């Protein structure tokens, strides 16, 4: 399909003359697929959108002075301390106090030394942007120390942090313990990498060279260092995004080993297209892999990789660039139910928008692909094809299992050479790990994802938190095959991407990091929904209606609840579950039954009535005295949803209702009244001060009169002024035309003559082109070009021409007399055609 799409692009770019008369039908069908809008099943909009600094969704923010690039986040085991890695600094924040204004925190400065910065600048890197120490790895190594690595001005270094006093670890001489970070941390701060610690051993996926052309998946901090083989091209310019540890040995009947999975995007060599094709991958290695004895020494003997496929279900349009992956595992014992949530973008753009997609992969599908067939490449043609012949035993790339132990193979060091030689060229699996697309967002570029499994009142739901490239946070819930975006929050200023997300599931907090700082956002905000309808229509698994307010489900105690709590994530049946008083049809609501806001209008003015809606998915319904408002000259609903009133001919009680999924609720109610002579009553019967809504230019102060009569119309004056203006312009024009009518006739007659015999301008040579003897063309311009009026030459004038040297043939002359121009003109013979008579 991609090859066809590229052919279509070249077909569209070809000149019209080169196009075939009838293009192939497949190209036309593909063009229709590319131009059609995404189906509404996957393209969703957030129900609620809140701007930055909204009081309805408060959250806390941390930022230190002169510090930027907050990229690494780590939460302590007890959840009380948040460790943050930034540019040349690390922080230990209290989750309770540090995010408050003036809160205390611990800061640890760790910058690159001056010599490394000088070398970095000498190598052509930017001193301010590149030659700094960006913290890329921040992991717990033990119960007392943290392990961290930074770019250190393109000379990556690693060190240890004492968690007790938050200082760098030192040796007996007082020097900071530093280790070479090559192979653990990238040189370039813009390069993506991933790392995790398993049983005290560090597994990383990064690049190991200054140029960034030596990628590797390695294990360090161990007595058995192992890495991928660079000469075998196991990795093709990868961009690592995530890694995960899955304890597959628990409950395994085959005696399988634990595995570490790496997620990345790379160039797919198995595809042949006109441009390099990016492919999303999942790679795995065994925890007990020690390398080979003779073949693949200190190299992985269990490295296998496969393609992750995330595409549209309708037309197969691929989202092939992996941005982030979150591993959701219920428990170590239930690792078979592990889900991998991935955020993807596309290498190609469909239309004018650059969207993203969220796909979910199951552990069952991953294991099926890694247990399937292999691919191999033909060295001569560089073509990849499926291996169908038998493979050696034990199975290449598999961990040491009970079947291998029965063959006296208890370690990878004991694997036969034929198995390892086969693996060197057969590291790519033939199958593709297919996914289920949950969400397609054409208007947002998702970059980070975090998932929390929430127990609701009746079921368990997966809540997704998605960070965008422009500082927004989407909160969505997965309900079967569908996804509902609960809310959209602007947590950072526009242009700052969300660089990291971290969940504190025990305290119900979400931490998000960007270039400018770190924010602490509560996962739930049930107090935002003030009615039963809003609480249920939100589909928020954290919230339920308690009978009087929307509360967090963790507060639900069945034995203490006086009324049953209501929650319906699947159907959101607010019309059936909420109280009857909230769902009465607006057509039968008596006027004046609901509280009405008193507003005052001035006569002959244009006014608007606001109707703010909390939900982006709801529609408005305006009623006047219980009947729907129809568009007219004096009443019109604006595109914003506000009601525009022109004049005061139609007054009464105006109500604005919100309609969403069959549920109706009153949003606003207005009772406008006309203020005579611009004077407003100070108070109404209830003692409240009425609101004056007016758009007139002259308004009267309270208790006074306007300087202009509010009820006077200037329509007649306007017509009189327009008439006088037209007369003042037309009369002088007509007078000038009548006075100069004779001149106009002469001008028009000259134009007719010129149209019959147009004259050309004389060609006068410039001075520098004249002959050196001083002789030149006659001073009188020869503008007739062989035509001369018989009476043009004045008496006594004589011009010598060729007619005086040779006899003039009268037969070759031609005289014409025009009825428009009565003066005769003569055209001479061909010999003297250009002479002056």
UniProtKB/Swiss-Prot annotation:
Q: Has keyword Signal?
A: yes
**What domain of life?**
Eukaryota
Q: Which ranges of this chain reside in the Cytoplasmic compartment per its record?
A: 739-837
Please give the residue positions where the record annotates the modification Phosphoserine.
793, 818, 830
The record describes its membrane topology as: Single-pass type I membrane protein
Protein's organism: Homo sapiens (Human)
Q: Disulfide connectivity?
A: 120-131, 149-158, 286-399, 310-359, 526-543, 611-656
Indicate which residues are glycosylated according to the record.
69, 96, 165, 410, 525, 630
Q: What is this protein called?
A: Semaphorin-4B
Domain PSI: where? 525-579
Could you list which ranges are Extracellular topological domains? 44-717
Record's SUPFAM superfamilies?
Plexin repeat (SSF103575), Sema domain (SSF101912)
Encoding gene, per UniProt annotation: SEMA4B
Give the subcellular location: Membrane
Keywords, in A-Z order: Developmental protein, Differentiation, Disulfide bond, Glycoprotein, Immunoglobulin domain, Membrane, Neurogenesis, Phosphoprotein, Signal, Transmembrane, Transmembrane helix
UniProt family annotation: Belongs to the semaphorin family.
